[in-house]
Every structure is written in structure tokens, then in C-alpha cells.
Design a protein with these regions (language model features):
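Juxtamembrane loop-helix boundary motifs flanking transmembrane segments in multi-pass membrane proteins
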Residues: 1-6, 65, 100, 152-156, ...
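Long, glycine/tryptophan/cysteine-rich extracytoplasmic
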Residues: 2-83, 199-269, 313-336
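Alpha-helical transmembrane segments and their helix-start/interface "positive-inside/aromatic belt" motifs
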Residues: 2-29, 102-107, 157-172, 203-212, ...
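Transmembrane alpha-helical segments in integral membrane proteins
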Residues: 8-11, 69-98, 217-224, 265-288, ...
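Transmembrane-helix bundle segments that line or gate the permeation/cavity pathway
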Residues: 11-151, 170-182
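Transmembrane helix-loop junctions in multipass membrane proteins, especially transporters and channels
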Residues: 28, 32-40, 126-127, 182-190, ...
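Alpha-helical transmembrane segments of multi-pass integral membrane proteins
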Residues: 101-161, 277-363
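Loop-centered beta-sheet repeat module
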Residues: 159-219
């Protein structure tokens, strides 16, 4: 029985990998055939396809940039690319679930097999210039492959689901603001595109990468609109009251950057409190008893803080060089702001009303 479960888990995990690795191989081979490579080694596109696949799981890389011979890293990876492995996992997992009646066991064995394959791919794809950080692969692929198998439509998840949908709504509003900012800075966007001059095929691939980076940029934009701010490399700061930028990389999506200070956005902190309040609104409305309201509100708030912290961490990172070591939000700063807002909302919606009821009951 155990052998059959393990075999099915490995088989379906390999199927999930193949569903996304083969398209990545096609893209890599097509790019190699049109642009070529300096070494002319046919293993380059094969390794590159694995790097694309690992990058879709947000696995960070160590880099040795040949032009400068300086070590660097790529930890700022496109969050939008997660949709591909999640789709592949959800496509393959049902057969594992059929083989193992206990759903949690099925999730564990599937995620374990998926993580093992990903770690092996990271090890065999290492080159002198690009090295996937293989020991971090389990920290990324196991949670992704495990969580992707969940059905969040269950009734017990409805409060968390509503909170997550609220966050998505605010995130989407920030994406709209990002688009408006790109339209307002069209000349800068055009100039950055001209500087890169990737050609037709390269331009299409570069456009795809920019689209996949939209969730990162939108989350950074949300942090800016809510008064938290972000960074664009070492020694920089962009917020409502500060604007210290030494230059911008030649990447079109950076054309959406603000051009100066906007002190009125300090009031965006009110939006942060509003976000948390809306997240907890169904709990406040449906639970009049203090204990039930406290339980559901605390659980939802804590899980929301964890989710926001993870998103903040994944949406930012180092972009190739040490000068761009911090591009995006500072994850612990976002977490601290969100935790403070959650504490204030819990105080005014759960604990103070509960205290008032207790005082009235004694009186």
C-alpha cells in the first residue's frame, strides 16, 4: 500500500513538473536558437529551461556576472509566474487523492515528491555563472506544492477567504493605479524600452516577464499608497514624505515610479486600518458573543499577518547587483505596520466592546 502511494505521488509530481518544464524548455530553446549564446554549448538552453522553471517557484539564484566579475543575486522574482506551477499541481493532485483516502497524507507525500524533484533539478542545473540556491528549494517548493492542493471553498475557511479576497481587492486597486502611473509616464516608459531594444522575439519574451512582475509592482504600489513606502536599492527611500532615488534600472515597469514627494499620501495609513477592518467585518457582524468573536478575529488577523508578511518578502529582493540589493518593500516594515493596524482594529472592535458589555452587565 505504502509503495503504491509513493509511486503515485512521484508519478503525479513528475507530471506536474513536466507540465511546466516542457513549455519552459520550448521558450529556452527558441530564445537560444534565435539569439545564440557566447559558449555555443547546447546544454545552455537545457539549464536555462530549468532555471525558468525554478524561477517560476521564486527560487533565488546566486550570480557571477561575467562583465563585472562581481557576485550578485537574483531574489526578486516574478510572483505572477506562480500561476503556472499552481495550475500544474492542481491538475495532477486528484489522482494522488484517489490513491490515498486520507487527504492530509496525500498532500504530504505529493509535496515531498515534488520537492525532491525540484531539489534534484536545482543541483544538476548549477553552472559557474548561475547557481540556484538548492538548499532553499524545499523552503519554497514544499509550501507551494502543499498549499496548492487545498480547497479553500470549505465552510470553515470562509472568514479567511473573505479576508484574502479583501486583500486581493486592494492589491488589484493598486494594480490599476500602477497602470495609470505607467500611462502618465508614457515618455519615460518609451525611453526605457528604446534603451533595451530587445528586438521582436526578445521584446515578446521581455513583455511576458514584465506582465509576470505586475503582482510584485502592484504590491509595492499598495505599500506606497498605504503610507509604508519602499526602496529602490541601497541608500534609497520612496514614501509620502521622502524621495531619495539615485537612478532607475532600464526596466520599463519602473517608469511607474513617483517623481517626488506626495505628503497627502500620509493619510494612506487610514486605508491600512480600513483594509483590516473590512477583513474582520463578517466576524464582527456574525459573532455577538465575546469568546467566538475573539477566537475568529484573532485567528483571521494572525493568518492575515502571516500572509501579508510572506507576500511582502516574496514581492521584493535583490536585482542582480549589490547596488540593487533592496528593491521593493522592506518585509518586516510591512509586517509591523499591518500588525499595528490589526492590533488597533482588534482593540476597537473586539476588546473595548467586550469590556463595555462586561461593565454594563455588572452594573
Amino acid at each position: 500500500m505504502f509503495g503504491r502511494i509513493l509511486a503515485v505521488s512521484i508519478q503525479q509530481a513528475a507530471r506536474s513538473v513536466a507540465l511546466t518544464l516542457f513549455p519552459a524548455s520550448f521558450i529556452s530553446l527558441f530564445a537560444w536558437a534565435t539569439a545564440g549564446s557566447q559558449s555555443g554549448n547546447t546544454t545552455d538552453p537545457i539549464r536555462a529551461s530549468v532555471w525558468i522553471w525554478l524561477g517560476a517557484h521564486l527560487i533565488p539564484f546566486h550570480l557571477n556576472i561575467a562583465a563585472s566579475h562581481l557576485p550578485g543575486a537574483l531574489t526578486l522574482l516574478p510572483m505572477g509566474a506562480l500561476i503556472f506551477p499552481i495550475w500544474a499541481i492542481r491538475k495532477s493532485f486528484p489522482k494522488v487523492k484517489d490513491a490515498l483516502p486520507k487527504i492530509e497524507g496525500a498532500r504530504f507525500f505529493f509535496a515531498l515528491a515534488y520537492t525532491l524533484i525540484a531539489t534534484i533539478l536545482a543541483l544538476i542545473s548549477t553552472s559557474s555563472g548561475i547557481k540556484p540556491i538548492w538548499y532553499l528549494v524545499p523552503l519554497f517548493t514544499f509550501p507551494i506544492s502543499y498549499i496548492a492542493t487545498y480547497d479553500f471553498k470549505a465552510a470553515e475557511n470562509r472568514y479567511l477567504r473573505f479576508a484574502f479576497h479583501t486583500l486581493i481587492f486592494f492589491w488589484g486597486a493598486a494594480a490599476i493605479a500602477l497602470g495609470l502611473s505607467l500611462a502618465a509616464h508614457w515618455s519615460v516608459l518609451h525611453d526605457l524600452g528604446v534603451v533595451i531594444a530587445p528586438g521582436i522575439i526578445g521584446g515578446l519574451l521581455f513583455l511576458l516577464i514584465q506582465i509576470l512582475y505586475i503582482p510584485n509592482a502592484a504590491f509595492v504600489g499598495l505599500a506606497y499608497l498605504l503610507g509604508i513606502g519602499f526602496k529602490l536599492g541601497s541608500g534609497t527611500s520612496v514614501s509620502a514624505t521622502t524621495f531619495t532615488v539615485h537612478g532607475i534600472p532600464a526596466i520599463p515597469i519602473f517608469a511607474a515610479l513617483p517623481t517626488g514627494r506626495h505628503p497627502l499620501l500620509q493619510f494612506g495609513l487610514i486605508g491600512l486600518f480600513l483594509l483590516v477592518l473590512i477583513m474582520l467585518l463578517p466576524i464582527i457582524r456574525e459573532n455577538s458573543l465575546f469568546k467566538s468573536r475573539q477566537f475568529f478575529a484573532l485567528r483571521t488577523a494572525l493568518l492575515a499577518i502571516i500572509i501579508v508578511t510572506v507576500i511582502a518578502y516574496l514581492s521584493s529582493g535583490e536585482l542582480l547587483t549589490s547596488e540593487l540589493q533592496i528593491v521593493g518593500v522592506t518585509w518586516w516594515r510591512v509586517s509591523a505596520f499591518f500588525a499595528a493596524a490589526s492590533s488597533a482594529v482588534l482593540l476597537f472592535t473586539v476588546y473595548i466592546p467586550g469590556l463595555i458589555k462586561r461593565v454594563r452587565a455588572r452594573g
